[in-house]
Each structure stands twice: as C-alpha cells, then as structure tokens.
From Swiss-Prot:
This is Carboxy-S-adenosyl-L-methionine synthase. Gene3D superfamilies: Vaccinia Virus protein VP39 (3.40.50.150). It comes from Vibrio parahaemolyticus serotype O3:K6 (strain RIMD 2210633). It catalyses: prephenate + S-adenosyl-L-methionine = carboxy-S-adenosyl-L-methionine + 3-phenylpyruvate + H2O. GO terms for biological process: tRNA wobble uridine modification.
Length: 245
C-alpha cells in the first residue's frame, strides 16, 4: 500500500531554466503519484521486497532501507517480518521525505520498530544486517561512491544476508536501449504525462541520475564478493536485482 498524494504537475508548465532534479518539498508532496506513473512495475517491486525480506530476515538483526523516500519499502518489509528482535533503519537525506516518512510509519502499528534517520546513506554504519534495500537510490550516487557503499553493505551483512537493489538500467546494444527508452516514454504517456512533462523531467534528471547496465552491477557484485546475484524483476528499462552474501 502506498500513501496517497497530490497529482504530479511539477513539469506540466514550460520552465525557462530547468535546474537539476531534487527531492525537495514539492517532490515529496507528489512522490507517490510521480513514482507510480513514472516507474514501470514499481508496485510489484515494493510488494516483492516484503516477500524477499520475509525469506531472508533473521531474528535479532537489522534491516536497512537506504534512500527510503516515503517509506514504501520499509512498510512492505515491516508487514512481512515475523521474526523477533528485528529493527528497520530507514535513511534518507531529504528533510521533506523524512518528515513524511515518519508520519507514514507511525500510522501503522507493528511489533517491528522503525527508526527513520535523516542522513547521507554514504555515512551510515551498516551492522548486523540480514536485509539491505537500495530502491532506486544507487543511481543517484557517483560511480566511485556506489562501489564504496556496496562494499560497506557487504561488510555489514550477515552471512546469507541479502541486498535488494532496484535501478533504472542502460543497455549496451544501442537499438535495445533506444527501444526500451521509447517504451518507457509510452508508459508515461499512457499514465497521463504530456510530451512537455516527459521532456522537462528528462532534462532535469539526466545530470543527477546516471544508470548502470546489468553487466556493470553484476561485475561490481562479483568483485565485492557476493556469492549469488541476478535480476529478479524487470519491466522495460527498470528492474530489481538481489545479491546474497
């Protein structure tokens, strides 16, 4: 279940000078609508994150949601966690997102406590973790920061622990890449976004979100030492991967 929000009209009117996309108050207000209409398969990913957490969570361990935004993945995991002594740490560097995330988390009663932290995920200590989630977050970090964060996650995971990584993908074959971009734009059109909105959002986000290929992700997982990893979900050029320690 995702929190309701106002409709996303941020890029509906012409903007003279388009700045870089930021997760500010305006975005936080419309985020559930924005992400449902922009990310193919988002609801499926959120639901399955809960199911994956249920399989991999261990008693008396920590679960991390890094780049938690409004807490959709956190809430999905908390609904599925039945083990004793578990704690979810949800982290985001956007004050507007953190404020709303706390409201959403506090609206549901659960035996699994959630701590919502306003911080840079690169500075968070990962320890005693059985599950770590990076849901459309890693792609906003610089390439060198991505590797360092994944190394830190690996070190903080218990043996048998899982990293769930959802990302937008680029494809090495140019024809495939362009086709999947076009299909994604068709998806956005079908969800009511205009050509102006699609174009302006793309201009705003292209400098701050730099996606990797699935091959890049797998090579990184292998180099860091994860024993098993693969794609478990994909819709167009969006998908989710697992990596098991």
């Amino acid at each position: 279940m995702n929190p309701k929000s106002n409709p996303d009209t941020i890029f509906s009117a012409p903007i003279d000078k388009i700045g870089d996309f930021t997760f500010d108050e305006r975005v936080a207000e419309v985020f559930p609508d924005m992400i449902q209409r922009s990310v193919p398969g988002y609801s499926n990913i959120i639901s399955a994150i809960g199911m994956l957490a249920e399989r991999f969570v261990k008693p008396h361990s920590n679960i991390y949601d890094l780049g938690c935004s409004l807490g959709a993945a956190t809430l999905s995991m908390r609904r599925h966690i039945k083990q004793e002594g578990c704690k979810i740490i949800a982290v985001d560097n956007s004050p507007a997102m953190v404020e709303r995330c706390k409201l959403h988390v506090n609206a549901y009663r659960s035996d699994t406590p959630v701590t919502v932290v306003e911080a840079d995920i690169r500075n968070i200590e990962i320890e005693n973790a059985s599950v770590v989630v990076l849901n459309f977050t890693l792609q906003f970090l610089s390439p060198e920061d991505r590797y360092a964060l994944l190394e830190k996650i690996y070190a903080g995971l218990r043996p048998g622990g899982i990293l769930i990584l959802s990302e937008k993908f680029v494809f090495e074959d140019e024809v495939s890449n362009e086709l999947l971009i076009d299909l994604h734009h068709d998806f956005k059109r079908a969800n009511g976004y205009s050509e102006l909105e699609i174009s302006q959002k793309r201009s705003a986000i292209e400098n701050v979100m730099r996606p990797d290929s699935k091959k890049d992700h797998k090579e990184r997982f292998a180099k860091i030492g994860f024993s098993s990893y693969d794609v478990w979900f994909q819709c167009f050029n969006f998908g989710s991967m697992f990596a098991i320690k």
